UniProtKB/Swiss-Prot annotation:
The lineage of its organism: Bacteria, Pseudomonadati, Pseudomonadota, Betaproteobacteria, Burkholderiales. GO terms for cellular component: large ribosomal subunit. It comes from Paracidovorax citrulli (strain AAC00-1) (Acidovorax citrulli). GO terms for biological process: translation. The keyword RNA-binding does not apply. The keyword Cell membrane does not apply. InterPro entries: Ribosomal_bL32, Ribosomal_bL32_bact, Ribosomal_zn-bd. Residues 1-60 are annotated as: Disordered. This is Large ribosomal subunit protein bL32. One of its GO terms (molecular function) is structural constituent of ribosome. Belongs to the bacterial ribosomal protein bL32 family. Residues 9-19 have a biased composition (Basic residues). The gene is rpmF. Keywords: Ribonucleoprotein, Ribosomal protein.
């Protein structure tokens, strides 16, 4: 089992944790419908970058 040789100082502990910060996911607004969606994903209505790429079940 791994055991530390020396105690890690609060500064080094903070540096170790500096990469653990959470980031907010990128959210985009669809220009045609005004709905929000994740970047590089289609909106719930099936639109992507102003074009309808997926038909709704009601339209099919």
């Amino acid at each position: 089992m791994a055991v530390q040789q020396n105690k890690k100082s609060p500064s080094k502990r903070g540096m170790h944790r500096s990469h653990n910060a959470l980031t907010v996911p990128g959210i985009a607004v669809e220009p045609t419908t005004g709905e929000t969606h994740l970047r590089h994903h289609i909106s719930p209505n099936g639109f992507y970058r102003g074009r309808q790429v997926l038909k709704n079940k009601s339209e099919a």
